[in-house]
């Protein structure tokens, strides 16, 4: 799917309660990593529940171009035959990642640690996103940049070494993408690669490396044990395995918040990943008074999952600490929507990382709130939203800036605001939640093509 085509406006209109049960799409983070580790493993990897959104399909295409055999065997069911560490081939063409920041950055770690040369590119949004933080440690490990756009952006050609150099690297910010890129490059390094993070970020790469047979240790470190030291023993033999992809908590966030703010709603979300490094939004919403019940907690694909029963709730404003940001970095747009229905002020602290997402997400959220009559302010890197416990006015048109999460968040606002809300382009929702529209319609939502009449 091209993100350079004509915009497709979409409008959400307030209506009756939302009711029903759904399984949100497979987790995007785990889907990317399943493709990448399947490429690097020896033998066959079977994936169930893969997210078949544009981002993950771009990563699958890149893995295929680097030598993996990849077959789709049914909905969400994929078979990958890998080439092993050191067995990749130079791709014939450019690796076009579209809008996929995660896929492109993780694959830079893979290419930067192996004896291949590849050119990375993407859409207009990806071309604006900074890659230097990913590249800095990879260059220390022996990779070379053959060519790059200004400021270390794509299009960018990267050449990896015969063997990577093992390093000890302290992350400048809590970032699962940087950590993962270093660990993936370290797979082809003799000896030990160590990553130190001041605050724990998503740990899917560590969990999945372990699942595929790598030796990874994680120990608490830093002030109060909030940080992590991750150590990888290089040049393991990764073995193909079965991966069951749990439902993505970042995608579940949209129907979840919709059920909280549309009066009379009750929705069950099935099989949602409950990894504590991904559930900051649920923790915050419960603090705000949300009626969210965990049912049938169980293990799937190395992760804890649960069914969530969500009922419409009266919410109150809360203070969200900055250290919670890594566990909910993608959920602030939808949290801002929930906060606009709450009684009182919600302050979201330390959101600097939102400025380098698919859009300047902080500015995009603020503009969307302004367009729909929500009282808010930005103070430094903090977002402050004040509600009166009633539905906000709505009636606005929101500029999405090619950002799928901005589009979905403000469509959810439109389901419970006083007047319909239009997003200027809904095409990129397919990036992470291709079935968003039919899923929401099945619950009783009113979401239609075109601008509000």
UniProtKB/Swiss-Prot annotation:
<comment type="pathway">
    <text>Metabolic intermediate biosynthesis; chorismate biosynthesis; chorismate from D-erythrose 4-phosphate and phosphoenolpyruvate: step 6/7.</text>
</comment>
<feature type="binding site">
    <location>
        <position position="29"/>
    </location>
    <ligand>
        <name>3-phosphoshikimate</name>
    </ligand>
</feature>
<feature type="binding site">
    <location>
        <position position="129"/>
    </location>
    <ligand>
        <name>phosphoenolpyruvate</name>
    </ligand>
</feature>
<dbReference type="InterPro" id="IPR001986">
    <property type="entry name" value="Enolpyruvate_Tfrase_dom"/>
</dbReference>
<feature type="binding site">
    <location>
        <position position="101"/>
    </location>
    <ligand>
        <name>phosphoenolpyruvate</name>
    </ligand>
</feature>
<feature type="active site" description="Proton acceptor">
    <location>
        <position position="330"/>
    </location>
</feature>
<feature type="binding site">
    <location>
        <position position="330"/>
    </location>
    <ligand>
        <name>3-phosphoshikimate</name>
    </ligand>
</feature>
<dbReference type="InterPro" id="IPR006264">
    <property type="entry name" value="EPSP_synthase"/>
</dbReference>
<feature type="binding site">
    <location>
        <position position="177"/>
    </location>
    <ligand>
        <name>phosphoenolpyruvate</name>
    </ligand>
</feature>
<feature type="binding site">
    <location>
        <position position="357"/>
    </location>
    <ligand>
        <name>3-phosphoshikimate</name>
    </ligand>
</feature>
<dbReference type="GO" id="GO:0005737">
    <property type="term" value="C:cytoplasm"/>
</dbReference>
<feature type="binding site">
    <location>
        <position position="175"/>
    </location>
    <ligand>
        <name>3-phosphoshikimate</name>
    </ligand>
</feature>
<feature type="binding site">
    <location>
        <position position="28"/>
    </location>
    <ligand>
        <name>phosphoenolpyruvate</name>
    </ligand>
</feature>
<feature type="binding site">
    <location>
        <position position="405"/>
    </location>
    <ligand>
        <name>phosphoenolpyruvate</name>
    </ligand>
</feature>
<keyword id="KW-0057">Aromatic amino acid biosynthesis</keyword>
<dbReference type="GO" id="GO:0009423">
    <property type="term" value="P:chorismate biosynthetic process"/>
</dbReference>
<dbReference type="InterPro" id="IPR023193">
    <property type="entry name" value="EPSP_synthase_CS"/>
</dbReference>
<keyword id="KW-0808">Transferase</keyword>
<feature type="binding site">
    <location>
        <position position="361"/>
    </location>
    <ligand>
        <name>phosphoenolpyruvate</name>
    </ligand>
</feature>
<dbReference type="InterPro" id="IPR013792">
    <property type="entry name" value="RNA3'P_cycl/enolpyr_Trfase_a/b"/>
</dbReference>
<keyword id="KW-0028">Amino-acid biosynthesis</keyword>
<comment type="subunit">
    <text>Monomer.</text>
</comment>
<dbReference type="InterPro" id="IPR036968">
    <property type="entry name" value="Enolpyruvate_Tfrase_sf"/>
</dbReference>
<comment type="similarity">
    <text>Belongs to the EPSP synthase family.</text>
</comment>
<feature type="binding site">
    <location>
        <position position="177"/>
    </location>
    <ligand>
        <name>3-phosphoshikimate</name>
    </ligand>
</feature>
<feature type="region of interest" description="Disordered">
    <location>
        <begin position="1"/>
        <end position="27"/>
    </location>
</feature>
<dbReference type="GO" id="GO:0008652">
    <property type="term" value="P:amino acid biosynthetic process"/>
</dbReference>
<comment type="function">
    <text>Catalyzes the transfer of the enolpyruvyl moiety of phosphoenolpyruvate (PEP) to the 5-hydroxyl of shikimate-3-phosphate (S3P) to produce enolpyruvyl shikimate-3-phosphate and inorganic phosphate.</text>
</comment>
<dbReference type="GO" id="GO:0003866">
    <property type="term" value="F:3-phosphoshikimate 1-carboxyvinyltransferase activity"/>
</dbReference>
<dbReference type="Pfam" id="PF00275">
    <property type="entry name" value="EPSP_synthase"/>
</dbReference>
<keyword id="KW-0963">Cytoplasm</keyword>
<dbReference type="GO" id="GO:0009073">
    <property type="term" value="P:aromatic amino acid family biosynthetic process"/>
</dbReference>
<feature type="binding site">
    <location>
        <position position="28"/>
    </location>
    <ligand>
        <name>3-phosphoshikimate</name>
    </ligand>
</feature>
<feature type="binding site">
    <location>
        <position position="33"/>
    </location>
    <ligand>
        <name>3-phosphoshikimate</name>
    </ligand>
</feature>
<protein>
    <recommendedName>
        <fullName>3-phosphoshikimate 1-carboxyvinyltransferase</fullName>
        <ecNumber>2.5.1.19</ecNumber>
    </recommendedName>
</protein>
